[in-house]
């Protein structure tokens, strides 16, 4: 059993490149291919990605359009992002553009409401 623990320790210390090289050497030595298990793992990964999408916890707030009250929207973007005046103006003029990324659902809804109250059209994705 001590030999297995040593092997695990040795394998854990390999870099990614060394692990890939080891995989190729074992394929050659044993006459097998790792292609089939990789395809199965990729299919399983796709199913896992679908589950993750349903349980989305991070959202992006997108400024779709500045609207008629562009100055108020620029002020609100500055308050939300902490950007300077020029950067906030550039962001507003480049709409559609992400104002805030990777925020929780409540914060995203709050930011969207603030932008809409300032006269902009915003979206949460």
Swiss-Prot record:
Q: Which Gene3D superfamilies match?
A: 3.30.1390.10, Single helix bin
Q: Which GO terms describe its molecular function?
A: mRNA binding; structural constituent of ribosome
Q: Tell me which Pfam families the record gives.
A: Ribosomal_L12 (PF00542), Ribosomal_L12_N (PF16320)
Keywords, A to Z, come to: Ribonucleoprotein, Ribosomal protein
Any one biological process term the GO annotation gives: translation
- Name one cellular component (GO) term: cytosolic large ribosomal subunit
Assembly and binders: Homodimer. Part of the ribosomal stalk of the 50S ribosomal subunit. Forms a multimeric L10(L12)X complex, where L10 forms an elongated spine to which 2 to 4 L12 dimers bind in a sequential fashion. Binds GTP-bound translation factors.
Q: What does this protein do?
A: Forms part of the ribosomal stalk which helps the ribosome interact with GTP-bound translation factors. Is thus essential for accurate translation.
Q: Which family does it belong to?
A: Belongs to the bacterial ribosomal protein bL12 family.
* Name of the protein this chain belongs to: Large ribosomal subunit protein bL12
The coding gene here is rplL
